[in-house]
């Protein structure tokens, strides 16, 4: 999930600037993405309460995966801001629901180890997405393949989440009390 989100977040301003949008518009799209992200975190928390954290994580991951592929194709100013807002909600929802998912599915006795592993792979994913966006841009001269790569990484994440979900069987959600 982190590869998908980081590529979009890091490359939205240069991509929009390269496509002829003013720097103010490009920065405004990033600001919109981040500000709506605040609502995404709160929204994901509420959705976790309703359908469970792993399902919410999958839903938000699916949202960011479907939305990320559209960034290089949107031409209108309204479309850019709408896509930035929807993606911001989804990507922040991924982050919030992933935290809750780990806390719910991991036994407390191994929580520190689990969080170390999750954090390690999250940071690797963040770096990979940012780097690959630039690498693919340099290789192809455009952002279409970079954002397609982000969507492919989102699909891999969804496959992993689906396998994890079905491998757990029908378990009842566990309340985590701090």
Question: Residue locations for each model-derived region?
Answer:
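Intracellular juxtamembrane helix-capping segments at the cytosolic ends
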Residues: 93-106
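Symmetry-related core transmembrane helices of the 12-TM Major Facilitator Superfamily/SLC fold
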Residues: 145-164
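Paired small-residue
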Residues: 67, 78-86
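C-terminal ends and interior cores of transmembrane alpha-helices
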Residues: 63-75
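Extracytoplasmic gate region of multi-pass secondary transporters
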Residues: 1-44, 129
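A late C-terminal transmembrane helix in Major Facilitator Superfamily
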Residues: 105-142, 150
């Amino acid at each position: 999930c982190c590869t998908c989100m980081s590529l979009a977040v890091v490359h939205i301003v240069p991509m929009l600037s390269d496509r002829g949008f003013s720097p103010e518009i490009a920065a405004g799209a990033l600001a919109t993405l981040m500000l709506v992200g605040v609502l995404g975190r709160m929204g994901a928390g509420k959705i976790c309460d309703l359908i469970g954290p792993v399902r919410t994580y999958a839903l938000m991951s699916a949202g960011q995966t479907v939305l990320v592929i559209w960034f290089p194709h949107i031409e209108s100013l309204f479309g850019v801001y709408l896509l930035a807002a929807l993606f911001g909600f989804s990507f922040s929802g991924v982050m919030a629901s992933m935290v809750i998912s780990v806390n719910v599915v991991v036994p407390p006795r191994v929580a520190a180890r689990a969080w170390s592993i999750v954090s390690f792979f999250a940071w690797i994913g963040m770096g990979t997405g940012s780097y690959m966006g630039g690498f693919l841009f340099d290789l192809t001269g455009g952002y279409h393949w970079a954002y397609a790569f982000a969507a492919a990484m989102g699909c891999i994440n969804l496959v992993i989440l689906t396998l994890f979900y079905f491998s757990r069987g029908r378990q009842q959600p566990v309340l985590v009390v701090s």
